[in-house]
Amino acid sequence: MNVIIKAVVTASTLLMVSFSSFETSAQSPLLKEQIESIVIGKKATVGVAVWGPDDLEPLLINPFEKFPMQSVFKLHLAMLVLHQVDQGKLDLNQTVIVNRAKVLQNTWAPIMKAYQGDEFSVPVQQLLQYSVSHSDNVACDLLFELVGGPAALHDYIQSMGIKETAVVANEAQMHADDQVQYQNWTSMKGAAEILKKFEQKTQLSETSQALLWKWMVETTTGPERLKGLLPAGTVVAHKTGTSGIKAGKTAATNDLGIILLPDGRPLLVAVFVKDSAESSRTNEAIIAQVAQTAYQFELKKLSALSPN
């Protein structure tokens, strides 16, 4: 069966989630039902991908919807930059000149507070760290300039065989027009596929893979999302994406990542909350509850396999 969770406008203008069909993988229908119970009734369109270590395919909820990625695309961008480093086209130690007056203004950019002066130099490795771990928008756009812009990133994603993901704009372009964010989209299948490509360690050198893993584990944004309800100390390598709020609606509250189970195996989870009329706290709680549910589901499978 196929699962589509759709937000529909009621007479009171509230967006309510309804279920018309279901798409599942070989995973237990129980996990699907548990996730449904989390998202039903929420004033949002919610997409979910869960790919357990024993699954040949991911469980997908709302698989045909296009979700704005927002800063989630910084994962894809980091993979492209590191890929070019592996090819010898870029060097992690090469520096980029940053002119304070010429970069995107009035945006989330902690790197601009870390440096003094009207102009300064930043190594590519530090731009990557700020872009991934801190979701820095200025660092992101400087990296885009190095690799050839959004079109180059789109082509790289397609070259990996990920067809249900598109990138057409950088941070500055999204800031100029909030509707542009919807053109940087992914399906939940695309979200699952980028995580799988990274988890399989087939796209990057060992050194680059280790660096990106470290930066994702050190992510400072979205602590109440995938990580929010997991046991303390659980290793989660993830990347968030967040839009602004306009007319009471949040276009994107996202998180996708790799959660390490107690036995060290990877659990891949992506949760995207689109066009939500819920509070930011509720949007993040949806993500946390889905991650917790998927994690506990895998723990029960492990427990069932353990000798008494």
Swiss-Prot record:
Judged by the first EC level, this protein's enzyme class is hydrolase
Q: Name one GO cellular component term.
A: extracellular region
Q: Which GO terms describe its biological process?
A: beta-lactam antibiotic catabolic process; response to antibiotic
Keyword presence, Secreted: yes
Q: Which InterPro entries match?
A: Beta-lactam/transpept-like, Beta-lactam_cat, Beta-lactam_class-A, Beta-lactam_class-A_AS
Q: Which reaction does it catalyse?
A: a beta-lactam + H2O = a substituted beta-amino acid
Impact of changing residue 184 to D on the protein? Abolishes hydrolysis of benzyl penicillin, cephalosporins and aztreonam
In terms of superkingdom, the source organism counts as Bacteria
What keywords tag this UniProt record? Antibiotic resistance, Hydrolase, Secreted, Signal
- EC number, as in UniProt: 3.5.2.6
Query: Any signal peptide, and if so, which residues?
Result: 1-26
Describe its partners and assembly state: Monomer.
Q: What else is known?
A: The class A beta-lactamase family has a specific amino-acid numbering system, sometimes called Ambler or ABL numbering and often misspelt as Amber. A multiple sequence alignment was used to derive a consensus sequence and then the consensus was numbered taking into account insertions and deletions. This allows use of identical numbers, e.g. for active site residues, despite differences in protein length. UniProt always uses natural numbering of residues, hence there appear to be differences in numbering between this entry and some papers.
Concerning its family, UniProt says: Belongs to the class-A beta-lactamase family.
What this protein is called in its record is: Extended-spectrum beta-lactamase PER-1
Q: Which organism is it from?
A: Pseudomonas aeruginosa
Gene giving rise to this polypeptide: PER-1
